[in-house]
Amino acid sequence: MESPVKEHREGTLIRVRVNPDADTTDLKGVDEWRGVLEVDVAAPPVKGKANRELLEFLGRKLNTTCELVSGEKSREKLVLARDVSVDEVKERLGLR
């Protein structure tokens, strides 16, 4: 199984699969086959709304700034969580 979180010189990279237009915004868990963190996002995938909601949600959960590295128009995204370690991300997201 590939972990959805990897160390990066500026923090931690998180591979995410987004399910937009969900009832609520919440973590669904890890898709072990794809090696991604599954996240439901209530916002629709229109004009970057789902991306903004994803980054704000992860930023609150991780208590840091998150930014989109790739996947702006895809369900699979790479997010950089700045200035937090892999262990901190795993702990704060309940991935242990």
Swiss-Prot record:
Organism domain of life: Archaea
CC terms in the record's Gene Ontology section: cytoplasm
SUPFAM superfamilies in the cross-refs: YggU-like (SSF69786)
SMART domains linked to this entry: DUF167
Alphabetized InterPro entries for the sequence: DUF167, YggU-like_sf
Pfam families the record matches: DUF167
UniProt family annotation: Belongs to the UPF0235 family.
Protein name: UPF0235 protein MK0273
